[in-house]
Amino acid sequence: MSELTHVRADGSAHMVDVTGKNETSRTAVAEGFVKMRGDVVKQLFSAGLPKGDALPVARIAGIMGAKKTPDIIPLCHPLPLGKITVDFFELTDGVRIEASVKTRGVTGVEMEALTAVSTAALTVYDMIKAVDKMAVIDGIRVLSKTGGKSGDWSVQ
């Protein structure tokens, strides 16, 4: 079983030392869902919400979220992010959000991909809550990662 890298033997948290690691190309893809009524899905994808066109706003929020990850998640290293994409896929009962993040660095970008999805999902929720108070954010997870000492990984 792997040990937690952010916790010392005495239980105290610390930022992992990555200064001795080699830079490699790294990517991570994450997804999440915002479940909502079908009529709200139609409003969301036709830019018909009372608050306006939510998807472009949520895309920018997701990109900003990825860039701000080390500011809001303790112990995350600041990374030079080379590429961030946030995409939305229409479902009958909501939207699937997928974020992809890429860097050339000494640590992975899974947290940045998760933060991009989370921030985009929160923004969608904020913009639909007036018309669907029962909306739910769900299923946020990493789908894949590449690069680094531990190698490539995918849910498939």
UniProtKB/Swiss-Prot annotation:
The keyword Lyase applies. Its EC number is 4.6.1.17. GO terms for biological process: Mo-molybdopterin cofactor biosynthetic process. Transmembrane segments: none annotated. GO terms for molecular function: cyclic pyranopterin monophosphate synthase activity. The active site is at D126. Pathway: Cofactor biosynthesis; molybdopterin biosynthesis. The keyword Lyase applies. Substrate binds at L75, C76, H77, M111, E112. It is an enzyme of class 4 (lyase). InterPro entries: MoaC, MoaC_bact/euk, MoaC_sf, MoCo_biosynth_MoaA/MoaC, Mopterin_CF_biosynth-C_dom. Keywords: Lyase, Molybdenum cofactor biosynthesis. It comes from the Bacteria. It catalyses: (8S)-3',8-cyclo-7,8-dihydroguanosine 5'-triphosphate = cyclic pyranopterin phosphate + diphosphate. HAMAP family: MoaC_B (MF_01224_B). Homohexamer; trimer of dimers. Belongs to the MoaC family. Catalyzes the conversion of (8S)-3',8-cyclo-7,8-dihydroguanosine 5'-triphosphate to cyclic pyranopterin monophosphate (cPMP). This is Cyclic pyranopterin monophosphate synthase. It comes from Corynebacterium glutamicum (strain ATCC 13032 / DSM 20300 / JCM 1318 / BCRC 11384 / CCUG 27702 / LMG 3730 / NBRC 12168 / NCIMB 10025 / NRRL B-2784 / 534). The lineage of its organism: Bacteria, Bacillati, Actinomycetota, Actinomycetes, Mycobacteriales.
